Every structure is written in structure tokens, then in C-alpha cells.
């Protein structure tokens, strides 16, 4: 890691472990919070406010992650830290082991039950997003994060769009141009339709499901025209009415040129052992007409994910998500930056410099539920259990607890030592909802630690007044001030330590590195960069080559 890549005030707060990836627009590290010990992922966006488009994308992603961060299948944004140059920005996320794209490229790693579990959690996240009238617009395997317990987190909301501020009807939901991964684009996006619906996400989910079943992308087009060709020779051809409903100016011409190509079915693209219900769900998601595709709520009731279906855990918002800046308003890049920092500082209730302390995104205040200790890994063939999470904070009553709730789950409230993250403590004599007089029992093998309650400001002032002592200078002991009658602390006295004697091992460490392996000799230490997955069974499997978008 180059020291110049991380600002000093960020390195003081987070201990950088290793670099996870780097691209043209940013770099991601695995790090540890020095205050709490929590492992996090830090994403540095280069020149996040270089122009109006990049500034708007950064603004949308942060605002939407603050809205959706309490959902168990959406990545949590923990902190926002401006860079020293006022151009870059650091986003601090919870850490995950890998992503679905890396898992698929490992080969036949996922069993059928894992595929069902992963797709069910993706549907849960998509339903929650769509209930707020937000479209992700960039769902693909690389944006689906996983851990060894088969937990799913949807990330990268940079291309997401809120429809809450737009008028109803096709005229209000105008389709703007955006650069998303071609292999997962819906036909209406490829045909430059004048409007769109949440069906664009459902098409992308169908492509993700097909890639999990097949082991490689369903439609790996090399251009927009080739992408349409692969789609139209696989799915049933649309009617003229369906083409007219898209509002595309040249969709009929494209269909005329591509409609005469030989057809193949989805069955021919998938392995012969594909479950029939998986194929049925895939066909219902990959419909050409957006209004004929299943919604996320309908797909959650499909037999393919029936064993995981639980309405109490499939949350929905009761109101639309409305961004602080109207979707129709176009601000300049400096205005987006100023507005972003102003909003987060106002919501955190703190006026400190964001460059020194971070902006303290309030998404970390969501109540979480600890995962059970006996969670199965991806390598096991046992049915993965989707954790029953605490409902996200939203307007309206909370949904009742699932009948299948695991009693060993322990409800915790995440707090940080940073005052920007702290929740207001309960009043005198109050306890948080659901708290009892005794601390909750921890799972076996977990060492619990009980800390004494910190004294209040009143008790501290009384103790200070009662223990006041006359302070005088003691020139015989170095001239420092000392309290009369106070006992001297030996650790503060000058210590006359003996001079260190040379020992056997006081020589250059490079002498012994050659016998400790090539990795340690070359790198000065054992690096985790040799594997893409940490603390899981995924890293032991060979990497199979596969196409990438």
C-alpha cells in the first residue's frame, strides 16, 4: 500500500490491512477501526465531484444508502470522510468476504440450496427498494456481496434512481442514459426506451439467476446490437403492441432485422439438472415486456424460494424515498458537495470539522441482530438459514416477529466511540425496549465482559470538590506539581533501567526470511493477497477462467 493513497486523518482512525481492489474511479481497502476493532471496507472515490454527473451519482448513492442501510440485505454505510484535497471522498462500509461474481467463477461451488438462499435474499432487498419507488439499475453479480454464512448484501447504488419525485405515468419516468453492465441490461434499456419501470431490476435479477444456474453469463453480448441479438433469439419474440408500449423510436426496425434469426430456448442454455421451478422462475423474469415480468413481491412467493418465504421478514416501506435534492433539479458539482456535507452534519447534530472526525452517517444506528454461532458455511450442504433481522426503522408499525425466529439470536445495538454515532441514552431508571435486569446470556464459547457504568457529570463534580488538595511544586523531584499528601505513583518517577545487553537475535530480520518461504522473503510478511476470500472455504478452490463484463 502506498502511504500517499490514504489521507493521514483516515489512517489515524482506521488501520489499513490490505487493498482489495483498484479501478479507474476508486480504490477499496480492508481496514480495522482503531476505536472499536470492527473490520470495515473503505472505498475511496477519486475526484468524486469532478463534474455534475459524478457529483450527482455520489450524492445519490450516499443519500440512498442512508435510507436503506437498516435492511439486512443492503450494505451498511458506516461513515463518510472527505479527503484533504476536498476532491476525493472516503466511504466506510461493513466488511464482507467476497462477491457473487467471484463465487460463480470458482466453478461448481454453490449447491442448489445456496442458489435458492442467495436469490431469496436478493428478492428481499429488491422488494424493499422498490417499495420506496427506487430502482437500482445496476444489479449484477459483482454488486452482490457474500460471506461464508451465505448472507447477501446488495451494494453500489451509484446508478440508482428515485421515482418518488417524478409524476406518475410514462411521461414522468423518463429514461436517462447511464452506463451499466451490458450483460444485465433490460431490452427497454438497450432499445433506448423513453421511460422505465422497476422491471429493469427484475430483468437483471433474471440474468443473475441464469448465471448462477449456468455458471456463466446468459447473454454475454459484445455490443448493444449483439446483446439484443442474443436476447431475441432466446426469449419469445415480442408483439408489435409490446414494442409500441416501450416508446422506442427504432425498436420495430431492430426486431425486423433480428426477428428472423433461428430461435433457441432457455432450456438449451442451462444444465440438464436445472430444477423445473428454477427454469419457470427464470422465464417469468426474462419476459420482453416489462409489465409481464414478475415483481419482487410476486417472485418471493414462487416455489423456487418457497422454503425461505416468510412475509414477516420481507419488509416494505410505507412511503416513497424522496431525496433532499429533487430529481429534476440539476446542481453544480460544488453545490452537490456542499449540500451533501451540510445534510449529514445537520443529521448528525454535530458541527465539528468533517475532515477531522468524519461525517458520521446515521445508518449505523440501525438495530442489528447477531448471527447464530452455528451458521453453516457455503461448503456445507445443510440448508442455510436466512437470519431473522430486526425490522428497519421506518414509519408505521413494526411487523411482528417471524414464527421461525431463532431464540439464540441476541439483539444488540451497534455503537461507536465517536459521538457522531452515539444514540441518546435512556432516561434515569429506563431501560431500552426488551431489556431485562440481567445481561443477556452469550452463546457458548463467547467470553462476556461486564463494564461498570460511567459516573455522571454531577457525581464527577462532587468527587472533584471533595478531593481537592493543595498543589505545590516539588523542586527536589523534578519541579513538577504534586498534591499535598498524595501518594506518589512509581510509574511517574524516573526509572533507572539497566542498559540493554546484546542478545542472540539482535540482527537484521532479513537474514532469516529466506527460510520462511518465498512470500515472507519477498513481501516482508505473509500477505493475504494470495486469496480473494478471507476466512472461508472459497479460497481453497481453483479459479476457473470465465468472461467478465
Swiss-Prot record:
Cell location: Cytoplasm, Cytoskeleton, Cilium basal body; Cell junction, Tight junction; Cytoplasm, Cytoskeleton, Microtubule organizing center, Centrosome, Centriole; Cytoplasmic vesicle, Autophagosome
GO MF annotations in UniProt: ATP binding; chromatin binding; kinase activity; MAP kinase activity; protein kinase activity; protein serine kinase activity
InterPro entries tied to this protein: Kinase-like_dom_sf (IPR011009), MAP_kinase (IPR050117), MAP_kinase_CS (IPR003527), Prot_kinase_dom (IPR000719), Protein_kinase_ATP_BS (IPR017441)
Catalytic activity: L-seryl-[protein] + ATP = O-phospho-L-seryl-[protein] + ADP + H(+); L-threonyl-[protein] + ATP = O-phospho-L-threonyl-[protein] + ADP + H(+)
Gene3D superfamilies: Phosphorylase Kinase, domain 1, Transferase(Phosphotransferase) domain 1
Motif placement: TXY: 176-178
Positions with biased composition (Polar residues): 456-467
GO BP of this protein: DNA damage response; dopamine uptake; endoplasmic reticulum organization; negative regulation of cell migration; positive regulation of cell population proliferation; positive regulation of metaphase/anaphase transition of meiosis I; positive regulation of spindle assembly; positive regulation of telomere maintenance
Binding annotation for ATP: 20-28, 43
Residue numbers carrying Phosphotyrosine: 178
Residue ranges, annotated region (Ubiquitin-conjugating): 1-20
Source superkingdom: Eukaryota
Comp. bias regions, Basic and acidic residues: 403-416, 493-502
Uppermost EC category: transferase
Residue segments, region Disordered: 370-507
Region (Necessary to interact with ESRRA, to regulate its subcellular localization and to inhibit its transcriptional activity): 266-286
UniProt keywords, alphabetically: ATP-binding, Cell junction, Cell projection, Cytoplasm, Cytoplasmic vesicle, Cytoskeleton, Golgi apparatus, Kinase, Methylation, Nucleotide-binding, Nucleus, Phosphoprotein, Repeat, Serine/threonine-protein kinase, Tight junction, Transferase, Ubl conjugation
EC number: 2.7.11.24
Tissue: Expressed at all stages of oocyte meiotic maturation.
Activity: how regulated: Activated by threonine and tyrosine phosphorylation. Inhibited by dual specificity phosphatases, such as DUSP1. Phosphorylation and activation in response to DNA damaging agents, serum stimulation. Constitutively activated when phosphorylated on Tyr-178. Activity depends on the relative rates of MAPK15 autophosphorylation and dephosphorylation by PTPN1.
Domain named Protein kinase: residues: 14-305
Cellular component GO terms held in the UniProt record: autophagosome; bicellular tight junction; cell-cell junction; centriole; ciliary basal body; cytoplasm; cytoplasmic vesicle; Golgi apparatus
Oligomeric form and interacting partners: Interacts with TGFB1I1. Interacts with CSK/c-Src, ABL1 and RET. Interacts with GABARAP, MAP1LC3B and GABARAPL1; controls, in a kinase-dependent fashion, both basal and starvation-induced autophagy. Interacts with ESRRA; promotes re-localization of ESRRA to the cytoplasm through a XPO1-dependent mechanism then inhibits ESRRA transcriptional activity. Interacts with PCNA; the interaction is chromatin binding- and kinase activity-dependent and prevents MDM2-mediated PCNA destruction by inhibiting the association of PCNA with MDM2. Interacts with DVL2.
Swiss-Prot/TrEMBL domain comment: The N-terminal region (1-20) is the minimal region necessary for ubiquitination and further proteasomal degradation. The TXY motif contains the threonine and tyrosine residues whose phosphorylation activates the MAP kinases.
Listed name of the protein: Mitogen-activated protein kinase 15
Originating organism: Mus musculus (Mouse)
Gene name linked to the record: Mapk15
Amino acid at each position: 500500500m502506498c502511504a500517499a493513497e490514504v489521507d493521514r486523518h483516515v489512517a489515524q482512525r482506521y488501520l489499513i490491512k490490505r487493498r482489495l481492489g483498484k479501478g479507474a474511479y476508486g480504490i477499496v481497502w480492508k481496514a480495522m477501526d482503531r476505536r472499536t476493532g470492527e473490520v470495515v471496507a473503505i472505498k475511496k472515490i477519486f475526484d468524486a465531484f469532478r463534474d455534475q454527473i459524478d457529483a450527482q451519482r455520489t450524492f445519490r448513492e450516499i443519500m440512498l444508502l442512508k435510507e436503506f442501510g437498516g435492511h439486512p440485505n443492503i450494505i451498511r454505510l458506516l461513515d463518510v470522510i472527505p479527503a484533504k484535497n476536498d476532491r476525493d471522498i472516503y466511504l466506510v462500509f461493513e466488511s464482507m468476504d467476497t462477491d457473487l461474481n467471484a463465487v460463480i467463477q470458482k466453478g461448481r461451488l454453490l449447491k442448489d440450496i445456496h442458489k435458492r438462499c442467495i436469490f431469496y435474499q436478493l428478492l428481499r432487498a429488491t422488494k424493499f427498494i422498490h417499495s420506496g419507488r427506487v430502482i437500482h439499475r445496476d444489479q449484477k453479480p459483482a454488486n452482490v456481496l457474500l460471506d461464508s454464512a451465505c448472507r447477501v448484501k446488495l451494494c453500489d447504488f451509484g446508478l440508482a434512481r428515485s421515482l418518488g419525485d417524478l409524476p406518475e405515468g410514462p411521461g414522468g419516468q423518463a429514461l436517462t442514459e447511464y452506463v451499466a453492465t451490458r450483460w444485465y441490461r433490460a431490452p427497454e434499456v438497450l432499445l433506448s426506451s423513453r421511460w422505465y419501470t422497476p422491471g429493469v431490476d427484475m430483468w437483471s435479477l433474471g440474468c443473475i439467476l441464469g448465471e448462477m444456474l449456468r455458471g456463466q453469463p446468459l447473454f454475454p453480448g459484445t455490443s448493444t446490437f449483439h446483446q439484443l441479438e442474443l436476447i431475441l433469439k432466446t426469449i419469445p419474440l415480442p408483439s408489435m403492441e409490446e414494442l409500441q408500449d416501450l416508446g422506442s423510436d427504432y425498436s420495430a426496425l431492430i426486431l425486423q432485422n433480428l426477428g428472423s434469426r433461428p430461435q433457441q430456448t432457455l432450456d438449451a442454455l442451462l444444465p440438464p439438472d436445472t430444477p423445473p421451478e428454477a427454469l419457470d422462475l427464470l422465464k417469468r423474469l426474462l419476459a420482453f415486456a416489462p409489465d409481464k415480468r414478475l415483481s419482487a413481491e410476486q417472485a418471493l412467493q414462487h416455489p423456487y424460494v418457497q422454503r425461505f418465504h416468510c412475509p414477516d421478514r420481507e419488509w416494505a416501506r410505507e412511503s416513497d424515498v424522496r431525496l433532499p435534492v429533487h430529481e429534476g433539479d440539476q446542481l453544480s458539482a460544488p453545490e452537490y458537495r456542499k449540500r451533501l456535507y451540510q445534510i449529514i452534519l445537520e443529521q448528525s447534530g454535530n458541527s465539528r470539522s468533517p475532515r477531522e472526525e468524519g461525517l458520521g452517517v446515521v445508518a449505523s444506528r440501525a438495530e442489528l441482530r447477531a448471527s447464530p454461532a452455528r451458521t453453516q458455511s457455503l461448503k456445507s450442504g445443510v440448508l442455510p438459514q436466512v437470519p431473522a433481522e430486526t425490522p428497519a426503522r421506518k414509519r408505521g408499525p413494526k411487523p411482528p416477529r417471524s414464527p421461525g425466529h431463532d431464540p439464540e439470536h441476541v439483539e444488540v445495538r451497534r455503537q461507536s466511540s465517536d459521538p457522531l454515532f452515539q444514540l441518546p441514552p435512556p432516561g434515569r431508571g429506563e431501560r431500552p425496549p426488551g431489556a431485562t435486569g440481567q445481561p443477556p446470556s452469550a452463546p457458548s464459547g463467547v467470553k462476556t465482559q461486564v463494564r461498570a457504568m460511567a459516573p455522571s457529570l454531577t457525581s464527577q463534580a462532587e468527587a472533584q470538590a471533595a478531593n481537592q488538595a493543595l498543589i505545590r511544586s516539588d523542586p527536589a523531584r523534578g519541579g513538577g506539581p504534586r498534591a499535598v499528601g498524595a501518594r506518589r505513583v512509581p510509574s511517574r518517577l524516573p526509572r533507572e533501567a539497566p542498559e540493554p545487553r546484546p542478545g542472540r537475535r539482535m540482527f537484521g530480520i532479513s537474514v532469516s526470511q529466506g527460510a520462511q518461504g518465498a512470500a515472507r522473503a519477498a513481501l516482508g510478511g505473509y500477505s493475504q493477497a494470495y486469496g480473494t476470500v478471507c476466512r472461508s472455504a472459497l479460497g481453497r478452490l481453483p479459479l476457473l477462467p470465465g468472461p467478465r463484463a
